[in-house]
Amino acid sequence: MAEVPPGPSSLLPPPAPAAPAAAELRCPFPAGAALACCSEDEEDDEEHEGGCGSPAGGEAATSAKARSCLRCPQLPPEQQQQQLNGLIGPELRHLRAAATLKSKVLSAAEAAAPDGASKVTATKGAEGHPGERPPHSVPNNARTALPGRSEAAAAAAGAASDPAAARNGLVEGTEQQEEEEMDEQVRLLSSSLTTGCSLRSSQGREAEPGEDRTIRYVRYESELQMPDIMRLITKDLSEPYSIYTYRYFIHNWPQLCFLAMVGEECVGAIVCKLDMHKKMFRRGYIAMLAVDSKYRRNGIGTNLVKKAIYAMVEGDCDEVVLETEITNKSALKLYENLGFVRDKRLFRYYLNGVDALRLKLWLR
């Protein structure tokens, strides 16, 4: 039965210290090991020579490996373990940080520039300095963990072709893309708020999508507008008027009658007159003012009163007067905001027994 030769590690004596002349051949790698210094061809030759099974062949292979290991310094066990695990020792961490920063800068530059321009720049840089290395160059074994220029260009092209992936955070985008996405979100939010506000009026009434909610102010034009005026005033005012009362004011002073229209619907009306008072000065009188309850608190009443006053001023008016119920706080506030003052209290002025206040506005 053939004897199995003992392993080289158990028979060979420990390696002798390296000669001073061999110090110049040491490996420049801080985490250098015997496997990093030997090339693949040398390892293959050693395996071929030691594969014959004779003790002499094993001793020759062991001696050759020992001689190759003398060229690299022995490192502490923890650094050897880092080298075996693919980690970079403390001595090369600054090189890795510099390489990472350089790769980020190159990726951003290639993403901003066209593909052709980036390729031409890379080619010119390689041809201009063939023998020089960049100041922060990294050894080949450390570069394997970093993405190359071609990979960065491919990632930038993928981000440009797939905006949805970049928007979801799958690909790191530039600051300009982030600003554009933020502006787009703001525009979408503002458009949604505008749509929600335009489809609902201030009183909560739903509006149809194609309906025009713009308030228009027009002057009285024809008898066809009389039913709308009567409907508004009869519904909102406590004092009933006959058709003759309306015609007295509107037919004699049509230039002092204004309507507020929303689409084809009349939502507000004012009826006034202007004549001589005691043969001394011209007095304007606001006889009726009504606004639909669904459209109140939109400034319609104020705008109608202003238009009537401007028309009276064009007719050389000296003062404007009106009467309103003493309990109608909203009407009193509207007129007082326009400069009217309380002139006189009229007791039991209306048919329902409520007192009235006479308000006056002096124009001269």
From Swiss-Prot:
CDD domains: NAT_SF. Its main location: cytoplasm. It is found in: Cytoplasm; Nucleus. Its EC number is 2.3.1.256. Keywords: Acetylation, Acyltransferase, Cytoplasm, Nucleus, Phosphoprotein, Transferase. InterPro entries: Acyl_CoA_acyltransferase, GNAT_dom, NAA30-like. Signal peptide: none annotated. Residues 1-21, 39-65, 110-164 are annotated as: Disordered. It is an enzyme of class 2 (transferase). Residues 152-164 have a biased composition (Low complexity). Component of the N-terminal acetyltransferase C (NatC) complex, which is composed of NAA35, NAA38 and NAA30. It catalyses: N-terminal L-methionyl-L-leucyl-[protein] + acetyl-CoA = N-terminal N(alpha)-acetyl-L-methionyl-L-leucyl-[protein] + CoA + H(+); N-terminal L-methionyl-L-isoleucyl-[protein] + acetyl-CoA = N-terminal N(alpha)-acetyl-L-methionyl-L-isoleucyl-[protein] + CoA + H(+); N-terminal L-methionyl-L-phenylalanyl-[protein] + acetyl-CoA = N-terminal N(alpha)-acetyl-L-methionyl-L-phenylalanyl-[protein] + CoA + H(+); N-terminal L-methionyl-L-tryptophyl-[protein] + acetyl-CoA = N-terminal N(alpha)-acetyl-L-methionyl-L-tryptophyl-[protein] + CoA + H(+). Residues 126-135 have a biased composition (Basic and acidic residues). It comes from Mus musculus. One of its GO terms (cellular component) is nucleus. Residues 216-364 form the N-acetyltransferase domain. This is N-alpha-acetyltransferase 30. Residues 39-48 have a biased composition (Acidic residues). Residues 1-18 have a biased composition (Pro residues). GO terms for biological process: protein stabilization. The modification Phosphoserine is found at S39, S54, S192, S198, S201. SUPFAM superfamilies: Acyl-CoA N-acyltransferases (Nat). The gene is Naa30. The modification N6-acetyllysine is found at K235. Belongs to the acetyltransferase family. MAK3 subfamily.
